[in-house]
Amino acid sequence: MMHFKSGLELTELQNMTVPEDDNVSNDSNDFTEVENGQINSKFISDRESRRSLTNSHLEKRKCDEYIPGTTSLGMSVFNLSNAIMGSGILGLAFALANTGILLFLILLTSVTLLSIYSINLLLICSKETGCMVYEKLGEQVFGTTGKLVIFGATSLQNTGAMLSYLFIVKNELPSAIKSLMGEEDAFSAWYVDGRVLVVMVTFGIILPLCLLKNLGYLGYTSGFSLSCMMFFLIVVIYKKFQTPCMSVEQNSTVSANVTDACTPKYVTFNSKTVYALPTIAFAFVCHPSVLPIYSELKDRSQKKMQMVSNISFFAMFVMYFLTAIFGYLTFYEKVQSDLLHKYQSTGDILILTVRLAVIVAVILTVPVLFFTVRSSLFELAKKTKFHLCRHVLVTIILLIIINLLVIFIPSMKDIFGVVGVTSANMLIFILPSSLYLKITNQDGDKGTQRIWAALFLGLGVLFSLISIPLVIYDWACSSGTDEGH
């Protein structure tokens, strides 16, 4: 997903100063019962319990390093929308084609509402602990294990996003070059091979950007990326009315088959239906960016940030649904997991323009995500001090691994499927609910909320138990030919 910068510094929330409890003071007025020269054990137990409470307040305040936010509500909505928006939008028409309009709308609405609820849980956890960094929140609640799990989930999500962006380069750059050369799609040469081009782009453009110590241009790329995706949506809607369904079925000779192929399906099930929910989940993940955006919000409060998330998710819901429905109604069951790849840019300046804009946007966004993944690795290895040789070596090795994956992964649906059922599920369902349940473990006043959070956690676990085996089963049963190529 498009990630929000927040000054490349993840600030933390400062809670109200915890008032000192007079009962916990070491007053000389405390009365100590002595029996046979020994202090009453009940008193010791009570004293230790109160000291433990004081220590817990001190622990809570470890996260209270606060710089007041300066970002307006409107700009925060824009930043969160940037964080939500990503390559997932290109796979939604494919998800709709394999579920039907009605079922897709139900799934899209459900994931939108559940994502908003998970952010609500995350904000409550942040308020209770005072932490404004996702990883530190995990460490505060679950210790080192929590920190490692959140690092792993966010790194996998960012890696999946990078893979999808580079897959767009692999898919779209050859078509753009052929169009600029005036060649047909059938034209083949080594310099229009997507595998060669993605390696050239990675080590010619992305590597130098990733080697920088800081990314000063980060604030500009997210806005540019969101603008490109909005431009893409406008083109998708426009092309629906410019592309007759008959042209999709160029090889069809039977009009009855064409008529059937051009009829929208409202509910459908097939072997690719399993990818719908992971793709939608992948498209809505923004949780690692929520707390940094919250920390920058002017006059922040949980209610105000919840309003930011509600507006952002509603806007993305509308944008996602429009892209999916118009993309589907243009190509019907012939739509691919990369919607943009289905449009022919030869002789079409509009498609060529949007294709080039999206390519530039994703190329500039990859280093942003790469910085996050590399920083996480250095943090885990406790190698936070800058070292040039290590910096260069790790960067090159990671980019080689990512390129190999992009070259051999057959289609974008596989990326959406794997990341959707693993890290996206963790970040949306499992982690926020687990953190909330742990934090409110001793709070008897939140019984109803804890039941809902437990059901939410169970839903995430169920999602994994059902989706992961089905995705693996589809891989095992898939033929050599793939629609995503």
From Swiss-Prot:
The modification Phosphoserine is found at residues 6, 25, 28, 49, 52, 56. It catalyses: L-glutamine(in) + Na(+)(in) = L-glutamine(out) + Na(+)(out); L-alanine(in) + Na(+)(in) = L-alanine(out) + Na(+)(out); L-histidine(in) + Na(+)(in) = L-histidine(out) + Na(+)(out); L-asparagine(in) + Na(+)(in) = L-asparagine(out) + Na(+)(out). Residues 98-112, 170-188, 238-273, 332-348, 413-414, 472-485 are extracellular. N-glycosylation plays an important role in the L-glutamine transport. Induction: Up-regulated by BDNF. Residues 1-74, 134-148, 212-216, 295-310, 370-391, 436-450 are cytoplasmic. GO terms for cellular component: axon; basolateral plasma membrane; external side of apical plasma membrane; membrane; neuronal cell body; plasma membrane. It comes from the Eukaryota. It is a multi-pass membrane protein. The chain crosses the membrane at residues 75-97, 113-133, 149-169, 189-211, 217-237, 274-294, 311-331, 349-369, 392-412, 415-435, 451-471. The keyword Zinc does not apply. The modification Phosphothreonine is found at residues 11, 54. It is found in: Cell membrane. Inhibited by alpha-(methylamino)isobutyric acid (MeAIB). Inhibited by lithium, potassium, choline ions, N-methylglucamine. The pH dependence has an allosteric effect on the transport. Glycans are attached at residues 251, 257. Changing residue 257 to Q: Affects N-glycosylation. Abolishes Nglycosylation. Does not affect cell membrane localization. Abolishes L-glutamine transport activity. It holds the Pfam family Aa_trans. GO terms for molecular function: alanine:sodium symporter activity; amino acid:sodium symporter activity; glycine:sodium symporter activity; L-glutamine transmembrane transporter activity; neutral L-amino acid:sodium symporter activity; proline:sodium symporter activity. Specifically expressed in brain and retina (at protein level). Also detected in spleen, small intestine and lung. Its main location: membrane. Keywords: Amino-acid transport, Cell membrane, Disulfide bond, Glycoprotein, Ion transport, Membrane, Phosphoprotein, Sodium, Sodium transport, Symport, Transmembrane, Transmembrane helix, Transport. Symporter that cotransports short-chain neutral amino acids and sodium ions from the extraccellular to the intracellular side of the cell membrane. The transport is elctrogenic, pH dependent and driven by the Na(+) electrochemical gradient. Participates in the astroglia-derived glutamine transport into GABAergic interneurons for neurotransmitter GABA de novo synthesis. May also contributes to amino acid transport in placental trophoblast. Regulates synaptic plasticity. Belongs to the amino acid/polyamine transporter 2 family. This is Sodium-coupled neutral amino acid symporter 1. The gene is Slc38a1.
